[in-house]
Structures are given as C-alpha cells and as structure tokens.
C-alpha cells in the first residue's frame, strides 16, 4: 500500500503537469485506467496474480511517462533542467524494471528485496533527486537551488551501484550485493549532504532573497516548458 500511495502521488503530479503539454486526451484516460488496474493488483493477493497485475500496469505506466511526460522536454535543455529531465526519465526506467520483477521474479529468493529496492530506491529516490532543484526551495522558502554539476557524479554512482545491487541479487552474488548495498546507502547520504552544502554555499555567496519558494517553483516549471 505504501508503494501504491507513492506511485499515485508521483504519477498524479506528473499527470497534472501534462496539461501544459499537447498530450491527447485519450492518453490521459489510458493512464487513469492503468492506475485503476494497479489498484486491482494491490487488492488481489500476490499468489493469485496480484503481482503480475501490478507488474504489467507499472510497466505500462512507466512507458506512458517516458512517452508523454514533460521530462523529455527538460532533458533537451541545459544545466539543472537537463539534470531534472534525465533524472525523471531514469526514474521511469526503474519503475519499468520494478514492473518486470513483479511479473517475472516473484519466486526468486530475494524477490521481496528486489521489489522494494527497484521501487523505493530506484523509482522514488530518482524522483527525489530530480525534483530537488525546484521542490526544495519551495519547502524551505529559499531562492537558492540545490544544483551543481558535481551532483552528476554522486547521482551516477547511486544509479550504477543500485543497478549492480539488483543484478547481483538476481544472480545470488551475496558478497557483491552486500558491498554495493553499503555503497548505495552512503551515496544517498552524500547526495543529501552535497545538496545542503550547495545551498549553504550559494546563500553565503549571494545572500538570502525575498523571492518565495513558490515563485521559484512556478518559474522553474515555465523554464522547463519553454
């Protein structure tokens, strides 16, 4: 149910933003139908096709987001907007991998870990990293955005270590899985520390601003779209 809550929250926000793009109405209805199908999968027991229903719906939701979401627009821009766009698209790929695991690896000895890690680490944390440059100023009421090109280093390390963690789990390489799991956890902490350091550095360098976080969010969204 936590997976369902986060999925509906994130996808609902992306669906709302899609109104600013020329997205056909049929595709929006299709996404709503896929979310309804995912809900059915949550209700049906996992041993009675529940996992498979959630898996196929998660895979198709990921495909919808890759095709229709504004991330494809942002990824063609520069600096932080490229970071946001690529981060979102990678998150959607993780959602697709999550769906594939639900459909095909339900009997694996580490299936529970694979399901949790692909969703909560792969999909959810990718969403956090991608939204941070616009959402964090809104949350903390500041103008400074937590973006610097150095974030690409830890972001890439996080994604690669998580991918290695998933592959080593599937192959039952427990020692490698353990090492990559520790690295993955530290990279999450480092990413947050870097973001905090970037904000503090920008505040000390340029001072505070009276511009509200909500205004930053609105301007950021406009820049992504135009």
Tell me the role of every PLM-derived stretch.
Residues 1-226:
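Hydrophobic alpha-helical transmembrane segments of multi-pass integral membrane proteins
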């Amino acid at each position: 149910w936590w997976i369902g809550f986060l999925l509906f929250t994130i996808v609902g926000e992306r669906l709302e933003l899609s109104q600013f793009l020329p997205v056909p109405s049929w595709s929006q209805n299709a996404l709503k139908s896929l979310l309804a199908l995912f809900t059915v999968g949550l209700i049906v027991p996992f041993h009675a096709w529940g996992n498979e229903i959630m898996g196929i719906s998660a895979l198709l939701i990921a495909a919808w987001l890759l095709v229709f979401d504004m991330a494809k627009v942002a990824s063609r821009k520069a600096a932080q907007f490229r970071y946001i766009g690529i981060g979102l698209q990678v998150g959607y790929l993780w959602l697709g991998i999550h769906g594939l695991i639900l459909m095909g690896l339900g009997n694996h000895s580490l299936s529970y870990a694979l399901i949790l890690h692909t969703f909560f680490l792969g999909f959810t944390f990718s969403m956090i990293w991608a939204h941070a440059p616009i959402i964090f100023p809104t949350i903390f009421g500041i103008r400074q955005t937590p973006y610097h090109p150095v974030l690409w280093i830890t972001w890439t390390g996080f994604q690669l270590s998580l991918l290695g963690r998933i592959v080593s789990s599937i192959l039952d390489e427990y020692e490698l899985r353990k090492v990559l799991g520790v690295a993955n956890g530290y990279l999450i902490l480092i990413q947050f520390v870097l973001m905090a350091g970037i904000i503090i550095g920008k505040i000390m360098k340029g001072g505070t601003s009276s511009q509200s976080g909500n205004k930053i969010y609105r301007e950021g969204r406009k820049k992504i779209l135009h």
